[in-house]
């Protein structure tokens, strides 16, 4: 059954605004011209891949996490639960136990180890998942509830939904959150290959180096795509050479590409060089994963 699992390609970046979603949406649409593909927007705090596709909604569901609810009638104020919680989601304040849902990681320790069952777990909505279809392209996005602070659980449950429903799709594209924090690690953790998108500027190079450190710590095979090539210098190119990082493509800086993007349109159909870059990127990912290269 292993060979039925999709090739998972995560597209990430050290900072926002580098073109991560541009690459994700265009690569997914390019693949969908020939094969079934699922594009998953894991930037759950600000998903926007859906702006580029007008698809049929095929599934929608709310996502919940479990949090403890204090039962005052059972509680003996023994003080065990605050000591158990590493995240300080449960505290004792005088004659009361206070639960902070936004800090809770749903580990169940306080509930399971309470000697009088005074902290039963209850569901709390953290976001919503939607699944669309556009021809051979399936698009899944999750959106974090306003006021929620933890994206990791929602990202994890979104990936599980994809595993449960798209195990036979040949390729899955994960549009990851920007940066190098916990949500990025969760989004890329199961990826077979990670594409890091950067821009040829000092700021882009700085954040790329942080993303490279993260991927190496996770022991993920990865390569770099330089977007808006031509706006700055070649320091990013030199960095990739010095660090022996595969440079997968250089997408040119273009006013026309920016205009298409701002109108919610894909760009590869109008730019043969971009379409060729997408083909090269895909070939490299497939060859690297199948060949077992790091």
Language model feature labels by segment:
Residues 44-46, 179, 201-203, 229-232, ...:
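Conserved nucleotide-binding/hydrolysis micro-motifs of P-loop NTPases
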Residues 42-43, 141-150, 157-184:
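Switch II (G3) loop of P-loop NTPases
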Residues 181-202, 208:
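Inter-motif core of Ras-like GTPase G domains
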Residues 2-32:
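Walker A (P-loop) phosphate-binding motif
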Residues 27-33, 54-77, 88-106:
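Ferredoxin-like iron-sulfur electron-transfer modules
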Residues 80-98, 109-125:
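Iron-sulfur cluster-binding cysteine motifs and their immediate structural context
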Residues 2, 212-294:
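C-terminal lobe/tail of nucleotide-utilizing enzymes
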Residues 35-50, 123-128:
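Short beta-strand-centered segment that lines the nucleotide-binding/catalytic pocket of NTP-utilizing
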